[in-house]
Amino acid sequence: MLNQLAIAEVGNPMLGNIIVVSGSFLILMFLLKHFAWGPISDILKKREDKIANDLDSAEKSRINSAKMEQEREQQLLASRSDAADIIKNAKESGELSRQNILKETQEEVARLKSKAQTDIMLERDTALNSVKDDVADLSLQIAAKILNKELSPEMHESLINQYIEGLGSSNETR
């Protein structure tokens, strides 16, 4: 091979250089293809796959983040709604309690008023009965004193008439 190169160089020095450079280039290309091109291609393919995966992962993360933000917003709205419901229920419960307390108080006042009126009526009736008993006792004492005295026929007739008139007026009032 060297002999041929030497012959080619003797005839045309430029042609020999072209052949040597071309041969060297072809050998270099063969070596690069055999030893470097596969690993370089693999590295580039891995890099391409990694970039694609990173882009997919970033897109999934963005979608997941948007979904989580939407869920958080929904939870926040639900929490606000729950809080509003709790406040509404507390107000309604408070109003109901207030109305119940007011109703119970009014019923207690009415019951106490009725009991007081009943007690007053009982006391009045007791007092009237006591007065009637006192009047009856007093009347009996007066009658006993009068009976102990000697009655004249005129007094006797007057007492009988008064008694009859008293019976008549008491029957008329009934």
Swiss-Prot record:
- Give the transmembrane region(s): 18-38
**GO MF terms, alphabetically ordered:** proton-transporting ATP synthase activity, rotational mechanism; proton-transporting ATPase activity, rotational mechanism
GO CC annotation: what is one? plasma membrane
**CDD domains with a match to the protein in the record:** ATP-synt_Fo_b
Record localization:
Cell membrane
Report the superkingdom from the record: Bacteria
Functionally, this protein is described as follows: F(1)F(0) ATP synthase produces ATP from ADP in the presence of a proton or sodium gradient. F-type ATPases consist of two structural domains, F(1) containing the extramembraneous catalytic core and F(0) containing the membrane proton channel, linked together by a central stalk and a peripheral stalk. During catalysis, ATP synthesis in the catalytic domain of F(1) is coupled via a rotary mechanism of the central stalk subunits to proton translocation. Component of the F(0) channel, it forms part of the peripheral stalk, linking F(1) to F(0).
* Subunit (UniProt): F-type ATPases have 2 components, F(1) - the catalytic core - and F(0) - the membrane proton channel. F(1) has five subunits: alpha(3), beta(3), gamma(1), delta(1), epsilon(1). F(0) has three main subunits: a(1), b(2) and c(10-14). The alpha and beta chains form an alternating ring which encloses part of the gamma chain. F(1) is attached to F(0) by a central stalk formed by the gamma and epsilon chains, while a peripheral stalk is formed by the delta and b chains.
Q: So what family is this one in?
A: Belongs to the ATPase B chain family.
Q: What is this protein called?
A: ATP synthase subunit b
Family annotation (HAMAP family):
ATP_synth_b_bprime (MF_01398)
Q: Which UniProt keywords apply?
A: ATP synthesis, Cell membrane, CF(0), Hydrogen ion transport, Ion transport, Membrane, Transmembrane, Transmembrane helix, Transport
The UniProt entry lists membrane topology as: Single-pass membrane protein
Lineage runs: Bacteria, Bacillati, Bacillota, Bacilli, Lactobacillales
Kindly give the PANTHER family that the UniProt entry links to this protein. Answer: ATP SYNTHASE SUBUNIT B, ATP SYNTHASE SUBUNIT B', CHLOROPLASTIC
